[in-house]
Curated annotation (Swiss-Prot):
This is Non-structural protein 5a. It comes from the Viruses. InterPro entries: Corona_5a.
Amino acid sequence: MKWLTSFVRAVISCYKPLLLTQLRVLDRLILDHGPKHILTCVRCVILFQLDLVYRLAYTPTQSLV
Protein backbone atom coordinates (compact mmCIF):
# COMPACT_ATOMS: atom_id res chain seq x y z
CA MET A 1 0.00 0.00 0.00
CA LYS A 2 2.98 2.29 0.40
CA TRP A 3 3.43 2.41 -3.38
CA LEU A 4 -0.18 3.55 -3.73
CA THR A 5 0.40 6.43 -1.32
CA SER A 6 3.51 7.44 -3.25
CA PHE A 7 1.61 7.24 -6.53
CA VAL A 8 -1.27 9.37 -5.22
CA ARG A 9 1.14 11.99 -3.92
CA ALA A 10 2.91 12.07 -7.31
CA VAL A 11 -0.41 12.56 -9.10
CA ILE A 12 -1.36 15.31 -6.66
CA SER A 13 1.97 17.06 -7.16
CA CYS A 14 1.29 17.17 -10.92
CA TYR A 15 -2.40 18.02 -10.66
CA LYS A 16 -2.07 20.92 -8.20
CA PRO A 17 -0.01 23.20 -10.52
CA LEU A 18 -2.43 22.45 -13.35
CA LEU A 19 -5.39 23.55 -11.23
CA LEU A 20 -3.56 26.68 -10.08
CA THR A 21 -2.75 27.60 -13.70
CA GLN A 22 -6.38 27.07 -14.71
CA LEU A 23 -7.48 29.27 -11.83
CA ARG A 24 -5.09 32.06 -12.87
CA VAL A 25 -6.29 31.93 -16.50
CA LEU A 26 -9.91 31.89 -15.40
CA ASP A 27 -9.40 34.84 -13.06
CA ARG A 28 -7.85 36.74 -15.97
CA LEU A 29 -10.86 35.92 -18.16
CA ILE A 30 -13.22 37.11 -15.44
CA LEU A 31 -11.27 40.36 -15.13
CA ASP A 32 -11.27 40.90 -18.91
CA HIS A 33 -14.85 39.87 -19.71
CA GLY A 34 -16.75 40.45 -16.49
CA PRO A 35 -18.20 37.97 -14.00
CA LYS A 36 -20.32 35.82 -16.31
CA HIS A 37 -22.29 33.03 -14.65
CA ILE A 38 -20.49 30.15 -16.39
CA LEU A 39 -17.03 31.52 -15.55
CA THR A 40 -18.03 31.92 -11.92
CA CYS A 41 -19.36 28.34 -11.81
CA VAL A 42 -16.18 26.96 -13.37
CA ARG A 43 -14.13 28.92 -10.82
CA CYS A 44 -16.12 27.33 -7.98
CA VAL A 45 -15.47 23.85 -9.42
CA ILE A 46 -11.73 24.52 -9.68
CA LEU A 47 -11.64 25.86 -6.11
CA PHE A 48 -13.48 22.75 -4.92
CA GLN A 49 -10.93 20.52 -6.69
CA LEU A 50 -8.07 22.50 -5.15
CA ASP A 51 -9.62 22.06 -1.72
CA LEU A 52 -9.76 18.29 -2.24
CA VAL A 53 -6.17 18.19 -3.49
CA TYR A 54 -4.91 20.09 -0.46
CA ARG A 55 -6.90 17.85 1.88
CA LEU A 56 -5.45 14.73 0.25
CA ALA A 57 -1.92 16.10 0.17
CA TYR A 58 -1.75 17.50 3.68
CA THR A 59 -3.94 15.14 5.70
CA PRO A 60 -1.85 12.74 7.76
CA THR A 61 -2.21 9.06 6.90
CA GLN A 62 -2.78 8.16 10.55
CA SER A 63 -5.57 9.61 12.63
CA LEU A 64 -4.44 12.14 15.23
CA VAL A 65 -7.07 11.00 17.74
